[in-house]
Design a protein with these regions (language model features):
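Solvent-exposed soluble domains appended to multi-pass membrane proteins
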Residues: 1-201
Length: 201
C-alpha cells in the first residue's frame, strides 16, 4: 500500500493508533493514562475474544511510556522484552538489537507448542535514533540503520518460510510512526507516508 500515513511521531502514540484506532494527541499520549486505555477498543482484544493467543516481542523496555500497561489492557497475554534477554545481548540504547530479537522470536515459534490461531507483535527498534546498529554497509548512519532493519526482517521471513506455519500466516509490516528525516516543506504529507506491507503463505 503506497497511500498509507503515520498517525504520530512517537511509539507511545503510534502503537495505540495501530492497535486501537485512537488518533495521536499532540502534547501527550493516552498510553500514559491506564484509566483511559482500559476503555479503548483493540485488535488484540477482538482477536482474544475470537480465540487467538496474543504475544508481544520487543528487545527494549516494555515499561517505557507505560507500554506494558497498555498492552495488557488491550489483551496481550505474554510479553517478551529486554529483561528476557541476557545482558550480553542488550548491546544498544534500546536493548537487544533486531537480529537478536528475531532470533528469539523464531526460536520460540519453532520450539514452543503454538496455540493456534495466534497474533504476535514484534516491535523493532534499530531504525530509531541514535541509529547505532551492528551492521556497517552504508556511510549514512540513518540509512545504514534502516538497511539493517530491512535485513533483519528479510532474514526472519526467509527462515519462517521454511516452517510449516508459513502457509497459514499473514505478516503485516507497518512502522509505528513517521521517519527520521525532516518533512519536505513543499509537501508536508510526504513526510508522513509509511509503508504497509502484507505477506504470507
Amino acid at each position: 500500500f503506497t497511500n498509507f500515513y503515520a498517525n504520530s511521531f512517537r511509539t507511545d502514540r503510534g502503537l495505540v493508533a495501530i492497535l486501537s484506532g485512537y488518533p495521536a494527541q499532540p502534547t501527550t499520549s493516552i498510553m500514559k493514562y491506564p484509566e483511559k486505555t482500559d476503555g479503548l477498543p483493540s485488535i488484540p482484544r477482538s482477536l482474544k475474544n475470537a480465540g487467538y493467543s496474543l504475544e508481544y516481542y520487543y528487545g527494549g523496555d516494555a515499561d517505557f511510556t507505560n507500554m506494558r500497561s497498555y498492552l495488557v489492557s488491550s489483551g496481550i497475554e505474554k510479553i517478551i522484552s529486554e529483561t528476557d534477554f541476557p545482558l550480553s545481548e542488550r548491546q544498544g540504547k534500546w536493548g537487544a538489537p533486531d537480529h537478536t530479537l528475531f532470533q528469539r522470536f523464531l526460536k520460540d515459534l519453532k520450539e514452543e507448542k503454538q496455540q493456534e490461531p495466534f497474533f504476535k507483535i514484534v516491535q523493532t527498534s534499530s531504525s530509531h535514533e541514535p541509529f547505532e546498529v551492528p551492521f556497517y554497509r552504508l556511510d549514512d548512519k540513518v540509512l545504514n540503520a534502516f538497511a539493517y532493519a530491512d535485513s533483519c526482517v528479510g532474514d526472519f521471513v526467509r527462515q519462517y518460510k521454511e516452517t510449516p506455519m508459513w502457509k497459514n500466516t499473514l505478516i503485516v509490516l507497518v512502522p509505528d510512526h513517521l521517519g527520521a528525516y525532516p518533512r519536505p516543506a513543499e509537501n508536508p504529507l510526504e513526510g508522513h507516508t509509511i509503508p504497509l506491507i502484507l505477506i504470507g503463505g
